C-alpha cells in the first residue's frame, strides 16, 4: 500500500506587542500556511524552507524551535503536511510569480492574530495553530 503524500511548510510568525502574528496565504477562497510537496530526495525541513521562499520571498527566517514540528491528519487524497515554526521580523511580503503558473500562487497574504487565524484557516489546521500559539507564547 502506498504511503501518504508528504508536504512540508512553516507556520511563519512575527512577534508584536499584541502577541504573535501568523502569516496566512490565500489561494482562491482558501487560507493556509506556506507549504508544498516534498521533492524526491529532499528532507522535509529543506522543503519547508524552499516552499516558504517560493511562495513568499522570505529567506531570512529563523527556526527558534529547531526541527520541532506538527503534522496534519491525512487529508485530500492521503496528503500529510508537516509544519515547522519559522520567525521573521519582515512585515511586507512579496507574492512571487510562479514560473509554472505565470502568476503568484496566492492571491493575498495576511498577518493574523491567533483568533483571526482560527477563523480563517480550515479545521484540519486547528491543532497546528494551537501548537504554534502554545509554543511561541511559551505556555
Where does each model-flagged region fall?
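The catalytic Nudix box helix
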Residues: 33-67
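Active-site-adjacent beta-strand/loop module that shapes the phosphate/pyrophosphate-binding cleft
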Residues: 5, 69-97, 110, 132-136
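Extracellular/periplasmic catalytic domains that process cell-envelope and extracellular macromolecules
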Residues: 16-17, 76-78, 105
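Short, charged/polar surface micro-motifs in flexible loops or helix N-caps
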Residues: 17-18, 30-31, 39, 85-93
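N-terminal strand-loop-strand
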Residues: 1-34, 45
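NUDIX/MutT-family hydrolases
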Residues: 95-132
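Residues immediately flanking
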Residues: 27, 88, 114
Amino acid at each position: 500500500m502506498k504511503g501518504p503524500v508528504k508536504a512540508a511548510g512553516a507556520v511563519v510568525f512575527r512577534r508584536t506587542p499584541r502577541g504573535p502574528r501568523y502569516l496566512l496565504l490565500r489561494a482562491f477562497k482558501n487560507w493556509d500556511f506556506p507549504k508544498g510537496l516534498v521533492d524526491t530526495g529532499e528532507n522535509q525541513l529543506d522543503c519547508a524552507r524552499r516552499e516558504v521562499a517560493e511562495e513568499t520571498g522570505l529567506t531570512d527566517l529563523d527556526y527558534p524551535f529547531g526541527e520541532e514540528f506538527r503534522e496534519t491528519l491525512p487529508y485530500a487524497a492521503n496528503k500529510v503536511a508537516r509544519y515547522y515554526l519559522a520567525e521573521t521580523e519582515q512585515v511586507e511580503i512579496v507574492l512571487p510569480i510562479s514560473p509554472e503558473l505565470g502568476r503568484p500562487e496566492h492571491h493575498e497574504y495576511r498577518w493574523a492574530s491567533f483568533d483571526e487565524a482560527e477563523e480563517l484557516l480550515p479545521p484540519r489546521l486547528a491543532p497546528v495553530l494551537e501548537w504554534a500559539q502554545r509554543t511561541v507564547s511559551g505556555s
